[in-house]
């Protein structure tokens, strides 16, 4: 199952459009057509089953057919981890934390940390990609770094 993400949809939404990049990916790369079924999440535990109503290169509009809400975990898992010198190791950690269902991640800058600057935009994209690839319905919250 391919999972797509749109943070603006709610239980009351009936029709919505993907942004230009996501629309291009759906129509050009995945070659989806009108009446194809897509699964979309808003990162808050909802899984929406949708049908494509308009498929063009720059705009993909879908109609929500049904939705389900995943039961939240009994426990909230919050990890606070210092970024490593090699950025790819921290990115790998973010992917795995998302896949196992961590709810919140806080980078910690310690006295002897070799990495003092955190690229939160890049890390947010990694969390989003990991959520979609692992079919996870909850997007972890990435907090600002603390010292």
Labelled PLM ranges:
Residues 1-70, 121:
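N-terminal positively charged helical leader segments and presequences
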């Amino acid at each position: 199952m391919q999972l797509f993400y749109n943070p603006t949809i709610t239980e009351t939404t009936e029709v919505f459009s993907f942004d230009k990049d996501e629309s291009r990916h759906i129509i050009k790369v995945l070659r989806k057509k009108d009446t194809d079924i897509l699964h979309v999440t808003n990162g808050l535990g909802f899984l929406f089953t949708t049908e494509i109503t308009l498929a063009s290169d720059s705009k993909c509009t879908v109609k929500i057919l049904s939705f389900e809400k995943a039961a939240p975990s009994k426990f909230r898992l919050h990890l606070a981890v210092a970024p490593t010198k090699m950025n790819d190791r921290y990115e790998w950690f973010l992917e795995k934390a998302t896949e196992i269902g961590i709810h919140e991640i806080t980078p910690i800058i310690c006295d002897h940390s070799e990495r003092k600057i955190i690229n939160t935009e890049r890390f947010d994209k990694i969390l989003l990609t990991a959520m979609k690839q692992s079919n996870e319905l909850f997007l972890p919250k990435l907090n600002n770094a603390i010292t």
